[in-house]
Amino acid sequence: NIGFDNFTTDYVIPVEVPHRAKDFDTYGLLFKGQSKNLFFLPDHDSWEETLRFVAEDNPLNWFKSLEADIVLLDGTFWDEKELKDRPQNKVSHPTVKNTLELVEKRDYGHPRIVFVHFNHTNPLHYPDSSEFKKVIDMGWEIGEEGMEFSI
């Protein structure tokens, strides 16, 4: 376990987020660059719980409050039907489908959102899938190994 009590830096800022285990803390990381900021959030609870925890009403408003230009975002599951043998409420992650409903189509001034951290069952692994196409058509991105970000 890594504790962030009294951890300070001007360039990497831990941002606490709720997650299913109550025995330890979960954090996203905000990297402050010379020209842009990148928020890495590969794991958190439902949007309802996370937004309540950070006192925001929408993911985009939260990202704006963090001054995030690029967001690497939890894309573990496409939807709640993805796991055949386990109910989705037992595996706390917001679905990409739910995230898209909240952020809608990318508009001027919105951060660059890149979905990452995919479960092996997620159809976003396949560029020819309708789900992959939907994310791209809405102006968002699918992370791929080796991507680099300049901040």
Model-assigned labels for residue ranges:
Residues 1-58, 64, 146-151:
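Core dinuclear metal-dependent hydrolase active-site scaffold
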